[in-house]
Amino acid sequence: YTVAVSSIYALYESLRLLEEEGLENRWNRHKVNAEKLRKGLTEIELNLPISPNDRLDQLTVVTKPDHIDDVEFRNKLIYDYNIEIGRGLGDFAGKVFRIGLMGESCKSEYVDQILEVFQKEI
């Protein structure tokens, strides 16, 4: 089999960016932006069903309000705002949204945009 060379280049570039930023700085950036996102979501009265001790800084789970259609809402975000969020999986399908803040997408301005759109559309 042939190795996917583009994957090797992507790994190299990802590791280069991580080295440039520093591991501790990257962890801190994820922590700060996750806290900002969670605070903003609770301020617009959305429920975060995962207990604080079990939360990940890279993924925030939000209970979907009953009046929101899951597919319609996620489609609106992606087509109107270029924001993609995940749906619930398994028993949580149609009940929660999953918002990822990982790597280069974990930026304060992205958190601001997500919160602004959620405030407007929910």
Where are these regions (language model features)?
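Conserved PLP-binding catalytic core of the aspartate aminotransferase-like
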Residues: 47-80
